[in-house]
Amino acid sequence: MWPGLVGKGDEEGQEPPISLERMLDLTAAAEVDGQKYDGIDYFLFLPHTNPEASDDELKGIADLIQGKGFDIGSLVAPVWPGTVGDSAMGTEEQRGKFLEAVKMACRIAKVFNEHGARKRGVIRIDSAEFGVEKWREDTAANTGTIVSTFKEAAKIAADHGERLAAEGEICWAGMHSWKDMLDVLEGVGMPEALGFQADLAHTYLYTLGYNAPEHALVQEGYSEEEFWPAYEKMTDALRPWTIDFHVAQNDGEVHGAGSHDKTGKHCPADDPNG
């Protein structure tokens, strides 16, 4: 249900959010050569979900989703500042908010699981520290803080029978390059509880070293012959940790509405590069 919320808002150039029911109807109507969607991913925050909703309210949401013909799959924890959470690289208070967001996500997952609407899927997180400037002030210490926060989050998830997936995007500190992402995953060292979610556009940008030129595997103007071995090196490194996959909405060059580095957020459906 992400496209109904990401990049949406009341700022200049933004469209208003699309309601949950409308998103479900649009998804149910999507069909190509007889292929339809059988499930959805789901962001655990307003306006689609109040993360503090009662069990009965959550069961009502699950009924609505199942009534449209869908299972609930991966959940997106509200880890960012302005939602429930805050930076995984921040102060003790900020990190506490991050962990509280993971706890809330696990609680909602349990309700959906017991209801029967959710049978599989991960809980998606990232470092919730936008941009790499602050991270660069002390890379080792800041990565260490993220690792520590993610370890605690992974323990919470494991205690609830859940698995976290850190989505590698070039805008999130400590996760902004394939090598730095690998450092975090290996630093946590809990593959049964924390893995990697590959985003198709951002793994492409990982290969270019967009926010980490020192980790670039190809340069702009690359040939096909140069690109594929480089891409394979990146995928070989991250494959053992990869537990979820995000089909990108563009080719890594489109800038949609919103603030994500390079790719913006979700681009219009009729964009030729979409």
Language model features with spans:
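Acidic/histidine-rich catalytic cores of soluble enzymes
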Residues: 141-143, 147-268
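Active-site-proximal loop/turn and secondary-structure-junction residues that shape catalytic pockets
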Residues: 3, 44-46, 78-81, 127-131, ...
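Active-site groove signature of glycoside hydrolases
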Residues: 109-139, 160-171
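Intrinsically disordered, low-complexity segments enriched in polar/charged small residues
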Residues: 100-102, 129, 147, 251
